[in-house]
Amino acid sequence: AVMCSKVVRVYIDVFRDGAIVSFNRQNVSSLEVNLRASSDRFQVGDVTRTDVAQSESRLSLARADLQNAEAQLISSKERYIALVGSAPEALETPPPLPGLPDSPESAVAVALTDNPDILATQKARNAARYDVKVAKAQAAPRVSAFVSGSYLDYLNSENPLITSPSNKDATAGAQITIPLYQGGRPGALARQSVARESQAIEQATEAERSIIAQTRSAYASWRASLQSIESTRKAVEATALSLEGVKAENSAGTRTILDILNAEQEALNARVQLVTAERNAYVAGFTLLAAMGHAEARDLNIDAGPLYDPVVNYKRVRGKWFDYDFDATPKPVATNTRGTATQTADIPPVAKP
């Protein structure tokens, strides 16, 4: 689930950073048009040199922001290659996440039942309990049984002492061993096993605490991101209307160039905040599913089998008893990325569903 979470995170990052690059490119284009218009109006004395300087300043800052956004997109695409093994091309829009809980209590209840870390510590605790029983058994009596038989055939033997042509012999018995004194070894082993069982119990409690905290935190982040999406969507709509109004008022002479520049910056910031909130909500939702133990392919409705099957190799080797039945020389399975082209700031296209 950890690796899958990393892939989901970088996948959404590519989408987010591509959108931010697109917004910044649109902003640069708009500011270039605004600068040309300001320069033309300055030539006819409609605006001052200060207005032109403000337009130039905002354009320079916008170009710097665009360069930073493009660098971030390239970084996300390279991290995508490092995790997936291929460049992001024609990415599909991420599907809705299934099985998200209605409350933090229900999320914690599922996590305590299905989280693999909790299940692992429970198995370790049970194994430690059996180790204690094995250690205490060192001081208990032992009973063993034995059976043996033999058959000898002296047919055609020339030995005069042999009176019977064959001889059959069978032996059976039982043996009980009662340890009287072993130098304190059984007690020491038992105390050691009890200490390890105590450690396993505390580790299980620690894992449970950690998973509860992770689940509640992920739920809170997910809900906060959803609320942020609603707020920023309203902000995007409001800033778009505000920008149109400021431009109209500027044409009427009641607004300055600086007012337009500020309105455009606010509109850009709102759109960037929206795609960031959408990214955060998706990542937080997947993190919540992972904390609940529901980040497997079967939970996500992915028809690709389990992300990891721990019994595949066991089934492959469980019937092999030959001493020289070795495995073949291992070969690379992961994709080599040496031949992958260096990524650019080109926005990956979105695949059609």
Positions of predicted regions on the chain:
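Sec/SRP-type N-terminal targeting helices
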Residues: 1-3, 25, 50, 54, ...
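Periplasmic alpha-helical coiled-coil/stalk elements that build and connect Gram-negative outer-membrane
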Residues: 2-112, 221, 225, 245-248, ...
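Small/polar, glycine/serine/threonine/aspartate-rich low-complexity segments that form flexible
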Residues: 93-101, 133, 146-189, 298-353
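Extended ligand-binding clefts on enzyme/binding-domain cores
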Residues: 117, 128, 141
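Extended amphipathic alpha-helical heptad-repeat regions
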Residues: 117-118, 271
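Membrane-embedded beta-strand positions of outer-membrane beta-barrel proteins
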Residues: 121, 143-147
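A contiguous, mid-protein "functional segment" used to position or interact
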Residues: 264-319
